[in-house]
Amino acid sequence: NMTEEEFKKELERLGISVTDEKMHQLEQFYEILIKTNKQMNLTRIVEKEEVYLKHFYDSLTLVKAYSFEGDLSLCDVGSGAGFPGIVLKIFFPNLKVTLIDALQKRINYLNEVIEALGLVGIEAVHVRAEDLARQNRKFDIVTARAVASLPKLLGWCMPLVQKNGVFLAMKGNVEEELD
């Protein structure tokens, strides 16, 4: 688990700038997540210090794989509770973010978070990845977190990745995936 102080220290170690405003946005995000989680299943991780580690910090470890600086578009596939999409948007406001999810009620929740946090240049869209790909939408970065097996994820996400773009899959255990 991770206290807010430890969280800030770890982000500095990753080279991510932390401001009071960003910490306040995370705090609001946490409150809406917990409130909404009582009505619908978004996460089984609800303990604050665990959310900071397993959802917030985990989302930001993607900076080890890719630089989010600059004018980039990002699509978060199966965004669900908003990880990593919303967390990345908070810390990299330059990103143009599209969160997609197949469930309308999750989109409603994501829109509530976006509005409460005053985020701009981010949209939550009720669409499946394969349907978005049919509309020829392309992104610099496509992220997905544990929504399916890796072969399935690749099938859904790769068509959304622009030439010279990247697909960043966040999966639990690498060994499990290789079996």
Residue locations for each model-derived region?
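Residue-level preference for alpha-helix termini and adjacent loops
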Residues: 17, 41-44, 50-51, 82, ...
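Conserved glycine-centered beta->alpha loop in an early N-terminal alpha/beta scaffold
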Residues: 78
